[in-house]
From Swiss-Prot:
Annotated protein name in UniProt: Ribosomal RNA small subunit methyltransferase G
Reaction(s) this enzyme catalyzes, per UniProt: guanosine(527) in 16S rRNA + S-adenosyl-L-methionine = N(7)-methylguanosine(527) in 16S rRNA + S-adenosyl-L-homocysteine
Cellular component terms (Gene Ontology): cytosol
Organism: Rickettsia typhi (strain ATCC VR-144 / Wilmington)
EC number(s) per entry: 2.1.1.170
Domain of life where this protein originates: Bacteria
Phylogenetic placement of the source organism: Bacteria, Pseudomonadati, Pseudomonadota, Alphaproteobacteria, Rickettsiales
Length: 191
């Protein structure tokens, strides 16, 4: 994946900020710091290949350390809303948002209470599909969900299909053999 040097510089600033804040609020596992670029930055950046138009509104739920939301904003997504319930992490996200030239809104609330419209909804290391779909019912997602998932993605799909109708594509992660990107659209709850 080719990344312009200006973006790499901003992502380096983000990395240093995360390392500094991680000592006090545990944004990422210490075990992932040696592979920070692959584990966090590239894992987030790979979503750009599924975003055809950067002039969109993207909502990232359970934003934590800003993956993938802040990374996607730095990479050029025009408007990003980061939803995070933990106030300490929101304070970090506010600082980190200054690295991007694009619009970033920090929302310190539980996801279930948010009513917002967006083109794309993302999350990483958040929860299973049923939980994601349940807690985002008040969020109007016009295009798709882009969800970074691990090895249990098939089980999650099967369980979610019991309560939800949706179309999906499975893309291989470029950073982890067992990782997948689920591209979900046409989501409807089964009554």
């Amino acid at each position: 994946m080719e990344v312009p040097s200006e973006i790499i510089q901003k992502l380096d600033i983000l990395q240093n900020l995360i390392k500094k804040w991680n000592k006090s609020i545990n944004l990422i596992s210490d075990n992932t710091i040696p592979n920070f670029w692959q584990r966090h930055i590239l894992d987030s950046l790979q979503l750009m290949q599924y975003i055809s138009n950067k002039e969109i509104h993207l909502v990232d739920i359970g934003s934590g350390a800003g993956f993938p939301g802040i990374v996607l904003s730095i990479a050029g997504v025009a408007k990003v809303s980061l939803i995070e319930a933990d106030l300490r992490k929101c304070i970090f996200l506010e600082k980190a948002s200054k690295i991007s030239n694009n619009s970033i809104q920090i929302i310190n609330q539980r996801i279930e209470k948010i009513e917002i419209d967006c083109n794309i909804l993302t999350c990483r290391a958040f929860s299973n599909l049923n939980t994601i779909f349940n807690c985002t019912q008040n969020i109007s997602v016009r295009e798709k969900f882009l969800l970074l998932k691990g090895k249990n993605y098939l089980t999650e799909i099967v369980k979610a299909k019991e309560k939800w109708l949706f179309d999906y594509l499975i893309h291989q992660s470029i950073t982890c053999r067992s990782g997948k990107i689920l591209e979900v659209n046409n989501l409807t709850k089964i009554i």
